[in-house]
């Protein structure tokens, strides 16, 4: 195998080099990113960290700011200006028809405005494979900014144009942007990162979702943009992250795995590895991908139906479906329904509640950052299983405190603690790890179809919660949280028995971990079992 590795390395023109990266790439912005390698922190013993590079940081931050940040922002941005938007709907209707809008019609229009974001997300998920096959990961993210910018302009100009339809259409287009972003960004980050930091880099998606939610809450304050005269600007600022991504990502290469396995462009793949890893000698990394490339070269991208039928990924698919369903059905969205009433019962003046609500966004962000810092130490399993388990426990506690909140003045404060604990539990694991696992469970040819399945479950579950929760809440009142507690506990139990730890494992090793449960082996393992089996058996 060593002789084989050397032959492949020479074929690619790779020779052992020193740490000097001055000749690793052409001059220009890309080289500047590579040369900032000296900013990375050192490790004991004088050894330098090889995991993080400035290019990885720029790719993750710029990618997430223009993608998952916008998803989180659009989840919360409609809350503060709700009364002003409804008034705008009524004024537009009265100007056209000569009479005020019927309350039921207004409720329907507002429900469509909120829920159509999820419909757009589903559409975006379904077109990912088609766009990604042609454009690749990076250029799909860049093209996706066209959806964000057009949606921002439509929504920001709706008041001036007197057309509420522009706001609804803009929300739909913004949903398409979110559907594409939540599929392509985790794929891109998973494929450009070394396995040692794949989880931490993947959590950037969740961190920026939380930052986006918090930013939407913050800008919605009356002192900022949450006023009747300025609410359209809440949607106009969506342009800023999109433009930042458009100006930064072009200087970075596409996923090296995509370039090598799907485009078969070895030279560009080598340069991409050099840029993202911040070193010139990437022969080992290229050889790891070539091991997959030797069998993947003749394998086309599988379809969603083929992936669902494949016995050798059956439990990976089931696990992705379970985690994504629990991600949306775990009840976090329902928490926002009770937040204002609970804060009010705790004695907080109504005018101050929007400011106190910022604490929920702050807790989300801190918990997501904590998860990103510890995920490579604790692993995926403890954070995901523990997160769902704690959510189930705190939902049960919240049900008790909400039932007894009129019996003592201090009980509502326990409810506030319960809400914050649920949010922290969600963001410390379930809020981001499902996206990471979807990227880790599948080989290159399967990954786009896997993200279509995951995204479809995600957006359909999102839509179902928005549609069904009002009826569940009306029927069960505060006991509705017991439904979410059951979902969380059930998900935790399933993951405890099925989910293997993927921390610091290659894609081949993760596939092997599922093989016994699947009772079937993927074709590449049969063809090149010496590669994968050798690595598995070599693990301590």
UniProtKB/Swiss-Prot annotation:
GO terms for biological process: D-glucose import; D-glucose transmembrane transport; dehydroascorbic acid transport; fructose transmembrane transport; hexose transmembrane transport; urate metabolic process; urate transport. GO terms for molecular function: carbohydrate:proton symporter activity; D-glucose transmembrane transporter activity; fructose transmembrane transporter activity; transmembrane transporter activity; urate transmembrane transporter activity. PANTHER family: SOLUTE CARRIER FAMILY 2, SOLUTE CARRIER FAMILY 2, FACILITATED GLUCOSE TRANSPORTER MEMBER 9. Changing residue 412 to R: In RHUC2; uncertain significance; according to PubMed:18701466 the variant results in decreased urate uptake, however according to PubMed:22132964 and PubMed:29967582 urate transport activity is not affected; no effect on Vmax for urate uptake; no effect on affinity for urate; no effect on protein expression; no effect on localization to plasma membrane; no effect on glucose transport. This is Solute carrier family 2, facilitated glucose transporter member 9. Changing residue 282 to I: No effect on urate transport activity. Residues 73-107, 162-171, 222-231, 338-354, 403-415, 473-478 are extracellular. Changing residue 210 to T: Decreased fructose transport. Higher affinity and lower transport capacity for urate. Keywords: Cell membrane, Disease variant, Glycoprotein, Membrane, Phosphoprotein, Transmembrane, Transmembrane helix. High-capacity urate transporter, which may play a role in the urate reabsorption by proximal tubules. May have a residual high-affinity, low-capacity glucose and fructose transporter activity. Transports urate at rates 45- to 60-fold faster than glucose. Does not transport galactose. May mediate small uptake of adenine but not of other nucleobases. Changing residue 333 to S: In RHUC2; decreased urate uptake; increased Km for urate; no effect on protein expression; no effect on glucose transport. The gene is SLC2A9. It comes from the Eukaryota.
